[in-house]
Amino acid sequence: SCDLLDTDIPGMHYQGDVRDLIFASEANWDMVIAFPPCTHLAVSGARYFAYKMELQQSSIDLFMMIANMDCPEIAIENPVGIMSTKWRKPDQIIQPWQFGHPESKKTCLWLKGLPLLKPTNILPFPECGYWNNQTPSGQNKLPPSPQRAMLRGITYQGIADAMADQWG
């Protein structure tokens, strides 16, 4: 794994900028599964796009740097956002409830050399009319906080397991 932040789980982890790894002279990638920051790409922040145009371009550049890597298999995960118009539509849109989690979070996958991710445990729509992470009106339950972006960006274990099992 690679992130600017510490890892939450044991295992190999590079704490730093992914560009350092992409441009390493000895880099020879078999597969890349990337989760670039969505803060400036997701449609949930659309009302701020004019204000953060420069930051948005930096995020687009990082996304495209990953997409254009010399690697036979690439998956890029991000929520519904501007990359569908800035680059191309995603190959697939998945939901946590397709992988055993009673939540809703539309997640786009842009794929190169990889098959579509097959759902592993599709849950029925709740009788109450909304998923565990939603209010009755369908909004996300998390209140504003310094941790909100990190908590909303967590990868669901069922999706991570499906990626490892099907692509690994």
Please state what every model-predicted region is.
Residues 1-168:
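Conserved active-site and SAM-binding loop architecture
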